[in-house]
Amino acid sequence: MTSMKLHIVALCIIVSFLVNVQSTRIMDASSDCEFKGPCHKKEDCYDSCGVNKPPFNNAICVPGRDSFQCCCILS
C-alpha cells in the first residue's frame, strides 16, 4: 500500500514538472508569437495585436506562467 502511494506521488511530481517545461516553451522568445499583455479571451487581444488592420495579424489568448497572455501570431 505504501509503495502504491509512493508511485502515485512520484507520478504526480513528474507530470507537474512536464507541465512546467511545456509552459516555459510556450513563452519562448523564438516562437511565432509576439506576447503583448494579459487577456481573458482572444477578443481582448484584438486591439493590442492590430487584428483587422494591416498586416492583419491573428491573435489568440494563451496560458502563460502566471496568467493568460495575448499571442500576436507573426505572419
Swiss-Prot record:
Keywords from the UniProt entry: Antimicrobial, Disulfide bond, Fungicide, Plant defense, Secreted, Signal
Signal sequence annotation: 1-23
Pfam families (alphabetical): AtDEF-like
A GO BP annotation: killing of cells of another organism
Keyword Cytoplasm: no
GO cellular component: extracellular region
Disulfide bridge map: 33-72, 39-61, 45-70, 49-71
Record bears the keyword Disulfide bond: yes
Compartments in which it is found: Secreted
Family assignment from sequence similarity: Belongs to the DEFL family.
Protein name listed in UniProt: Putative defensin-like protein 271
